[in-house]
Amino acid sequence: MKQFNYLSHKDLAVVVGGRNNWQTNVGGAVGSAMIGATVGGTICGPACAVAGAHYLPILWTAVTAATGGFGKIRK
Protein backbone atom coordinates (compact mmCIF):
# COMPACT_ATOMS: atom_id res chain seq x y z
CA MET A 1 0.00 0.00 0.00
CA LYS A 2 1.31 3.44 -0.91
CA GLN A 3 2.32 5.78 1.88
CA PHE A 4 0.76 9.21 2.14
CA ASN A 5 2.64 12.17 0.71
CA TYR A 6 2.70 15.19 2.99
CA LEU A 7 2.87 18.67 1.47
CA SER A 8 4.80 21.53 2.98
CA HIS A 9 3.56 25.13 2.99
CA LYS A 10 5.79 25.76 -0.02
CA ASP A 11 4.19 22.86 -1.91
CA LEU A 12 0.70 24.01 -0.98
CA ALA A 13 1.43 27.44 -2.44
CA VAL A 14 1.65 25.95 -5.94
CA VAL A 15 -1.64 24.02 -5.85
CA VAL A 16 -3.80 25.28 -8.70
CA GLY A 17 -7.53 25.00 -9.35
CA GLY A 18 -9.06 21.81 -10.62
CA ARG A 19 -10.88 21.00 -13.80
CA ASN A 20 -14.24 21.87 -12.28
CA ASN A 21 -15.41 25.34 -11.37
CA TRP A 22 -17.62 25.98 -8.36
CA GLN A 23 -20.82 25.83 -10.42
CA THR A 24 -19.92 22.36 -11.66
CA ASN A 25 -19.14 21.18 -8.13
CA VAL A 26 -22.38 22.55 -6.66
CA GLY A 27 -24.38 21.13 -9.55
CA GLY A 28 -22.73 17.73 -9.17
CA ALA A 29 -23.36 17.55 -5.43
CA VAL A 30 -26.98 18.73 -5.70
CA GLY A 31 -27.65 16.49 -8.68
CA SER A 32 -26.24 13.45 -6.93
CA ALA A 33 -28.37 14.19 -3.84
CA MET A 34 -31.49 14.41 -6.01
CA ILE A 35 -30.66 11.17 -7.83
CA GLY A 36 -29.89 9.42 -4.53
CA ALA A 37 -33.22 10.54 -3.06
CA THR A 38 -35.13 9.47 -6.16
CA VAL A 39 -33.52 6.04 -6.44
CA GLY A 40 -33.67 5.41 -2.68
CA GLY A 41 -37.30 6.51 -2.48
CA THR A 42 -38.20 4.23 -5.37
CA ILE A 43 -36.53 1.23 -3.74
CA CYS A 44 -37.90 1.38 -0.19
CA GLY A 45 -39.56 4.70 0.56
CA PRO A 46 -38.66 7.75 2.61
CA ALA A 47 -35.96 6.14 4.78
CA CYS A 48 -33.97 5.05 1.74
CA ALA A 49 -34.58 8.42 0.08
CA VAL A 50 -32.88 10.15 3.01
CA ALA A 51 -30.01 7.65 2.98
CA GLY A 52 -29.56 8.02 -0.78
CA ALA A 53 -29.62 11.81 -0.57
CA HIS A 54 -26.94 11.63 2.11
CA TYR A 55 -24.56 8.97 0.79
CA LEU A 56 -24.59 9.54 -2.97
CA PRO A 57 -23.06 13.06 -2.71
CA ILE A 58 -20.33 11.58 -0.50
CA LEU A 59 -19.62 9.00 -3.19
CA TRP A 60 -19.69 11.71 -5.89
CA THR A 61 -17.18 13.77 -3.88
CA ALA A 62 -14.86 10.80 -3.42
CA VAL A 63 -14.90 9.89 -7.11
CA THR A 64 -14.41 13.52 -8.20
CA ALA A 65 -11.48 13.93 -5.81
CA ALA A 66 -9.91 10.63 -6.88
CA THR A 67 -10.09 11.57 -10.55
CA GLY A 68 -8.56 15.03 -10.00
CA GLY A 69 -11.69 17.10 -10.50
CA PHE A 70 -11.02 19.38 -7.54
CA GLY A 71 -7.45 20.32 -8.23
CA LYS A 72 -3.98 19.31 -9.23
CA ILE A 73 -0.50 20.18 -8.12
CA ARG A 74 1.67 22.24 -10.44
CA LYS A 75 5.23 20.91 -10.68
From Swiss-Prot:
Subunit structure: This bacteriocin depends upon the complementation of two peptides for activity: LafA and LafX. Associated with a 180 kDa bacteriocin complex.
Spans through the membrane: none
Record's function text: Heat stable bacteriocin active against Enterococcus faecalis and other Lactobacilli.
InterPro entries: Bacteriocin_IIb_lactacin-rel
Keywords, comma-separated and alphabetical: Antibiotic, Antimicrobial, Bacteriocin
Family named by the database record: Belongs to the bacteriocin class IIB family.
Disulfide bonds: none
Organism this protein belongs to: Lactobacillus johnsonii (strain CNCM I-12250 / La1 / NCC 533)
GO biological process: defense response to bacterium; killing of cells of another organism
Protein name: Bacteriocin lactacin-F subunit LafA
Proregion positions: 1-18
Domain of life: Bacteria
